[in-house]
């Protein structure tokens, strides 16, 4: 194979690529910061691992997705539309509802100064109301409206009908603006929302509306309660078996009044209200009497006690456990700095959250004072607590609370103690600028060596990262292992929403214009050897003695007793002992012969199947038995694509061995013999008269009428470099030449090579200006082969 001879521009590009693609400093034998597998949209599609849904109207305007395992449907709310999609395959058997703004709503909206897009009806609320109905609310051209959708029972052939006779005003239930931040949760027929409740987007509040209980909200124009919040998520998490003690937790960011060093500091908050709050009797009438909040911290400990904070909450995910009172909270955060951009994921346990809300209150004596711990007497019942038996049972409703307790909660909504993450640090940090992380979903998996939380992280360019993190107690550090990088969509597009089904092992991903589903795993993609499977460290996968396949814990469809898996350490040598895994790989070592022209560039190509492996290059010179590691410099550059020689020297000739290293497992994956062709011999070859042979090119089998040339030009070239197996090379070159002829009839016409001989060109200089040809250039197919 001939190394392609590049122009000066090509050399410059390759050199720049080499500098950019060099391995970073401190690169270890296994770089788990790189994805083990990187799968394109086409590869996912070819593997039948994904399915996509496009709206037949050409647009979707996605704002919300609701995964309903009972109905076995994914409900989607967008612009003027609702969809019901099958969880098994979202592209099949879908139902749709067209729900636009009324002409009157749209007309009034435009008169008020909004554009036509804003005056559509964007569905922002979708909740399962009961077994047969959904609650849906839309922006209604800046005039929110709510209704019910009949979905029936799963046996009713996927019923999906809008009940238009039940329209209700949606103020306090749905935002006016389709782009404003919003969160909602439906509990016992009561809708709890965090939103901006007015036309101009100035009145931020937490509401409870809908059913038998009194409508409540936070007090308007109270910056100590909410100051320009961005609502992210909300969940009902019980504290105990007493349902009267249930609380709703709201996650949001806001400008922090207690930040003494900056008036524009942004903090992430956890707010809390009692589900059965009825407000006060004489003060805070129809207002929350139990609203409290505290800071949610996600930071990297630094030297001298100065931490790096990630204060902007992007997304939050609640991982349910067997104990519904103690789910695990995952927060995806970003920095608020205009200089430094980074992302982090922190994990919180409910015990830490409850301890913060049961701790001391924050207090400020006056404008000239700093925020401090409140050390005075706390009234009874404890401000912010619910009217329940757990609280003593003396009060059946918050309306009966003493004015002192209600007033204290009203004036002291902020807790002094922040909520800090597990291990006092993030489980994952991204500061390389490669990804902008936006969404998170988590699945808990039982593996051979323990329990792991698999993170699925959505980015702003349509990529999903599949990651696990492992905590090292000895070093108090986290190891992040990126298992897969999945290009879910054909073109880069921000991921707006993700829903996860552990039951089906499927991830549902929403963007503004398209929805996709992706299977959690495809174990056979890691490789066909035991070592490949164990080195992957995917808790879903294990070596079963024959292939890399889905791992099932003992007693759960365990088909084979032979299971090899080591997620924590990836110790393939120990797990695969006796499997002859090294021999299997070495037998597959690919051998190649590459010819390069002296003083030109050549790339010895190899792209490792896994990006986590360290790639080493060794060379064995002619007539030598010793191998030595290739030393890189400004002329020889190690790239992700292989080993690049910017300018070949005669001494570069030899046999090159490409090795990958992972967890002490060394694979020799490619053996390349590099032959150097002296520049003088190439000049001699091109100085001969080959016009007739080149103009006719190679005789193709289907074109017997073309005169056969006695000696194609490449044969003499092979004689110059000393290659003797003419028959094999001739068959290959005929195949390349004739394939190229069929594919590029116009581009490869005889006129293209008319002036390949410099002597002929000099004879023709009387007719046209003399232009020296690129006499080193060869047919591209041969150069690239």
Curated annotation (Swiss-Prot):
Alphabetized Gene3D superfamilies for the sequence:
ligand-binding face of the semaphorins, domain 2, YVTN repeat-like/Quinoprotein amine dehydrogenase
Check the UniProt entry and state the signal peptide residues, or none: 1-25
What is known about the tissue distribution of this protein? Collapsin-1, -2, -3, and -5 bind to overlapping but distinct axon tracts.
Residue pairs linked by disulfide bridges in the UniProt entry = 109-119, 137-146, 274-386, 298-346, 523-541, 658-733
Give the CDD domains listed for this entry: Ig_Sema3, Sema_3E
Gene Ontology BP annotations = angiogenesis; axon guidance; negative chemotaxis; neural crest cell migration; positive regulation of cell migration; semaphorin-plexin signaling pathway
* This protein's UniProt keywords: Angiogenesis, Developmental protein, Differentiation, Disulfide bond, Glycoprotein, Immunoglobulin domain, Neurogenesis, Secreted, Signal
Domain Sema: from-to ranges: 36-520
- One Gene Ontology MF term: neuropilin binding
So where does this one cross the membrane? none
Q: What is its main location?
A: secreted
Give the start-end ranges of region Disordered.
744-785
Q: Which InterPro entries match?
A: PSI, Semap_dom, Semap_dom_sf, Semaphorin, Semaphorin_3E_Sema, WD40/YVTN_repeat-like_dom_sf
Domain (Ig-like C2-type) ranges: 651-740
Q: Which GO terms describe its cellular component?
A: extracellular space; plasma membrane
Q: Which Pfam families match?
A: Sema (PF01403)
Q: Which family does it belong to?
A: Belongs to the semaphorin family.
Domain notes per entry: Strong binding to neuropilin is mediated by the carboxy third of the protein.
Question: What is the name of the protein in this document?
Answer: Semaphorin-3E
Gene (name only): SEMA3E
């Amino acid at each position: 194979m001939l190394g392609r001879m590049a122009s000066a521009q090509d050399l410059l590009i390759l050199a720049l690529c080499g500098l950019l693609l060099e391995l970073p400093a401190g690169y270890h034998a296994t770089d788990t910061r790189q994805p083990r597998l990187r799968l394109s949209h086409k590869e996912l599609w070819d593997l039948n691992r994904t399915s996509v849904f496009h709206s037949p109207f050409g647009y979707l305007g996605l704002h919300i997705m609701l995964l309903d395992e009972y109905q076995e449907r994914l409900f989607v709310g967008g612009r003027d539309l609702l969809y019901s999609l099958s969880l098994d395959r979202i592209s099949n058997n879908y139902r749709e509802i067209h729900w636009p703004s009324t002409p009157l709503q749209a007309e009034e909206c435009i008169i008020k100064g909004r554009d036509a897009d804003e005056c559509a009806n964007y569905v922002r609320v979708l909740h399962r109301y009961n077994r047969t109905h959904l609650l849906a609310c839309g922006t209604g051209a800046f005039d929110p409206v709510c209704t019910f959708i009949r979905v029936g029972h799963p046996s009713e052939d996927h019923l999906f009908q809008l009940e238009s006779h039940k329209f209700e005003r949606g103020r306090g239930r749905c935002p006016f603006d389709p782009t404003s931040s919003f969160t909602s949760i439906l509990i016992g027929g009561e809708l709890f929302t965090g939103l901006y409740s007015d036309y101009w987007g100035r009145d931020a509040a937490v509401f409870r509306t809908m059913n038998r209980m009194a409508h409540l909200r936070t007090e308007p124009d109270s910056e100590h309660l909410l100051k320009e919040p961005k609502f992210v998520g909300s969940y009902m998490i019980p504290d105990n078996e007493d349902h009267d003690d249930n609380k709703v937790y709201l996650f949001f960011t806001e400008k922090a009044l207690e930040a003494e060093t900056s008036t524009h500091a942004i903090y992430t908050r956890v707010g809390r209200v009692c589900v059965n709050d009825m407000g006060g009797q004489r003060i805070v009438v129809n207002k929350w009497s139990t609203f409290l909040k505290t800071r949610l911290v996600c930071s990297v400990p630094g030297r001298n006690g100065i931490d790096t904070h990630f204060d902007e909450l992007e997304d939050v995910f609640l991982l349910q456990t067997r104990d519904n009172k103690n789910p695990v909270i995952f927060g995806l955060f970003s920095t608020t700095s205009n200089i430094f951009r980074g992302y982090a994921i922190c994990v919180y346990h409910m015990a830490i959250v409850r301890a913060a809300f049961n701790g001391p209150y924050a207090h400020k004596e006056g404008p000239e004072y700093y925020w401090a711990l409140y050390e005075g007497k706390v009234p009874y019942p404890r401000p912010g607590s619910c009217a329940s038996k757990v609280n003593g049972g003396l009060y059946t409703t918050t309306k009966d609370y003493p004015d002192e307790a209600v007033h204290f909660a009203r004036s002291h909504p902020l807790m002094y103690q922040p909520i800090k993450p597990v291990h006092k640090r993030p489980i994952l940090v991204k500061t390389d600028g490669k990804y902008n992380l936006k969404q998170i979903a988590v699945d808990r998996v039982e593996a051979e060596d323990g329990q792991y939380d698999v993170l699925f992280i959505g980015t702003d360019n349509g990529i999903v990262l599949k990651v696990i993190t492992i905590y090292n107690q000895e070093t108090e550090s986290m190891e992040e292992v990126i298992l897969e990088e999945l290009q879910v969509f054909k073109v880069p597009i921000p991921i707006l929403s993700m829903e996860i089904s552990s039951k089906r092992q499927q991830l549902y991903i929403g963007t503004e214009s398209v929805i996709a589903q992706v299977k959690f795993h495809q174990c056979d993609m890691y490789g066909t050897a035991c070592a490949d499977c164990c080195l992957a460290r995917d808790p879903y996968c294990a070596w079963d003695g024959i292939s890399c396949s889905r791992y099932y814990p003992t007693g759960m469809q365990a088909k084979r007793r032979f299971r090899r898996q080591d997620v924590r350490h990836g110790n393939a040598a120990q797990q695969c002992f006796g499997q002859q895994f090294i021999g299997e790989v070495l037998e597959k070592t690919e051998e190649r012969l590459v010819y390069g022209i002296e003083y030109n560039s050549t790339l010895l190509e190899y792209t490792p199947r896994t990006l986590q492996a360290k790639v080493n290059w060794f060379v064995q010179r002619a007539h030598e038995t010793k191998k030595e590691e290739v030393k890189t410099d400004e002329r020889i550059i190690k790239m992700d694509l292989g080993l690049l020689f910017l300018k070949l020297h005669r001494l570069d000739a030899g046999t090159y061995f490409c090795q990958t290293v992972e967890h002490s497992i060394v694979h020799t994956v490619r053996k390349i013999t590099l032959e150097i062709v002296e520049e003088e011999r190439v000049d001699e070859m091109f100085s001969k008269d080959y016009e007739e042979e080149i103009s006719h090119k190679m005789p193709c089998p289907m074109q017997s009428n073309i005169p056969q040339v006695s000696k194609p030009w490449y044969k003499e070239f092979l004689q110059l470099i000393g290659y003797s197996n003419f028959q094999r090379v001739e068959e290959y070159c005929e195949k390349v030449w004739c394939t190229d002829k069929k594919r590029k009839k116009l581009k490869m016409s005889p006129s293209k090579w008319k002036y390949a001989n410099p002597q002929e060109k000099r004879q023709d200089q009387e007719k046209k200006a003399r232009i020296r040809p690129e006499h080193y250039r060869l047919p591209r197919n041969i150069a690239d082969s």
